[in-house]
């Protein structure tokens, strides 16, 4: 049984990328007397099955600043900690098939310029030059983020954990929070199956468990986990040939009106649809023993997105499916994860 400290300035609950990043940033701000509690293994909730995209695009100035900060941090975090985060700045192309969509991109370009995020506008022919497996039919243009791309979420989490530990933070895995109570002096008691911790602050980063965590302090946290699927395909000889010839990795391709993204993965492709009306899950919270959990895939639910992807990228129709990931992602009422 691992000994657990009895006091801390901050207790962070939840060992996904959000919780471990919070711990890392507290240490970087000079608060070394901090710890994190994770009921299972780090990343074992939603982080492990995330596709890891780094979308700089956001119409909000404040959220856009966070996205820019995050991408820049990930670029240097591996060197800082010695833990590779798997960042791939392969770019991101957002397609426009109508003027309303292009006007949205033009409006965003003003936000991007204010933030200091580089964007480019492409003609349909330029899209195909960069992403040769895409068809330009129906396109009026596109917007490209040259510095966008993806990261490996589990590796990123481990880099944050290493940086936090090096700064003095403690991480307690396989430790379950059983209660949170505010004491008469304003301090908090976090009760776990390995002992109690008295602390000044508690930070909940519990994802799909957020409602259960909130109930411990009398809060109704408006978070609903929903199912989110993405498809990983078998490899394709033409994609493998590109890599063998030393050509650059295909960037992230987004069909905004079709509500999907696609990127290269191990000689094949990943298709990530954003389903309208995706079913909610964990309505009563995940099982206490839930770890690295996936749900049964539902390809029929994805067919409109698959058909749209086949139209835009015909080789997608030729590819066998290697794996369908269907995992929980926690959403709030404003639609943001």
Question: What function would you assign to each model-found segment?
Answer:
Residues 27-48:
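Glycine-rich FAD pyrophosphate-binding loop
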Residues 65-68, 95-104, 144-165, 172, ...:
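Short beta-strand to alpha-helix junction loop
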């Amino acid at each position: 049984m691992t000994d657990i400290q009895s006091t801390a300035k901050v207790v962070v609950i939840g060992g996904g990328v959000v919780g471990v990043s919070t711990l890392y940033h507290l240490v970087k701000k000079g608060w070394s007397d901090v710890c994190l509690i994770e009921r299972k293994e780090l990343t074992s909730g939603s982080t492990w099955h995330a596709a890891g995209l780094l979308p700089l695009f956001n119409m909000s100035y404040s959220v856009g600043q966070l996205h820019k900060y995050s991408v820049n941090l990930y670029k240097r975090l591996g060197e800082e900690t010695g833990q590779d985060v798997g960042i791939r700045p392969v770019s991101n192309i957002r397609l426009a098939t109508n003027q309303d969509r292009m006007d949205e991109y033009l409006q965003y370009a003003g936000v991007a310029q204010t933030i200091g995020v580089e964007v480019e506008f492409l003609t349909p022919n330029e899209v195909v030059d960069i992403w040769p497996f895409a068809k330009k039919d129906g396109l009026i243009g596109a917007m490209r983020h040259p510095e966008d791309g993806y990261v490996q979420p589990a590796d990123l989490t481990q880099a944050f954990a290493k940086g936090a530990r090096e700064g003095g933070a403690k991480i307690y895995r396989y430790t379950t929070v059983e209660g949170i109570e505010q004491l008469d002096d304003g301090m908090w008691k976090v009760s776990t199956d390995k002992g109690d911790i008295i602390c000044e602050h508690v930070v909940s980063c519990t994802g799909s468990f957020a409602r259960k965590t909130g109930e411990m302090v009398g809060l109704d946290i408006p978070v609903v986990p929903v199912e989110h699927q993405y498809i990983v395909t078998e490899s394709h000889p033409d994609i493998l040939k590109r890599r063998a010839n030393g050509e650059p990795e295909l960037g992230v391709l987004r069909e905004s009106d079709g509500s999907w993204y696609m990127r290269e993965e191990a000689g094949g492709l990943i298709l990530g649809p954003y389903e309208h009306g995706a079913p909610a899950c964990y309505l009563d919270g995940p099982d206490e023993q839930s770890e690295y959990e996936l749900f049964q895939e539902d390809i029929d639910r994805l067919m409109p997105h698959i058909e749209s992807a086949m139209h835009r990228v015909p080789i997608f129709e030729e590819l066998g499916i290697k794996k369908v990931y269907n995992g929980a992602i926690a959403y709030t009422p404003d639609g943001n994860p």
